[in-house]
């Protein structure tokens, strides 16, 4: 699944998410897949799916399920995936969490307060997951995305604040002089690196990336 430079890019994705996730990323998108599949379903008979990795595992499963019966609701297809690959205990919450991840990529990042709610949903599942589930890449990948989105969201808010204060410092040049204003501006901009935010989320992302890498074998 490619979120840009593709036939069906992610619609309305904000620039910081697109730049940090990259073209090929963990991108479960059942609502979009349902729309695209059914839009063209009458023009062919079935399909062949392929993958450049496991990042789009759910989307492949979903698409083939729609080939089997295009009238199946998107939520039902994801629930079938969750019940089979994750287990019945978490299936309903996993399904809701997948759709929440898809919504994380819609619209201006700074205004998407649902990202924190999405993380809490996945953290609740993480707390209840058994050892086997916590070694299951099909669970770990969307869990990782929830942490990743929350990290980028907090970092983006922080860096927007840094940028705003840097502009304010530049506006002081007529009063303070250009050299002093520039020095102050550089110092403020440096806060993005000197005072990074949400490091606990970043560390959890790194742990989950490592786990996915090893559990995929």
Give the ranges of each region predicted by the language model.
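Aromatic/acidic polysaccharide-binding cleft in carbohydrate-active enzymes
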Residues: 44-72
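General secondary-structure edge motif
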Residues: 27, 61-62, 150
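Surface-exposed beta-strand edges and their flanking turn/coil or helix-capping segments
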Residues: 8-11, 60-62, 109-116
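Active-site core of glycosidic bond-cleaving carbohydrate-active enzymes
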Residues: 1-55, 171-175
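C-terminal non-catalytic alpha-helical accessory regions
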Residues: 51-56, 71-217
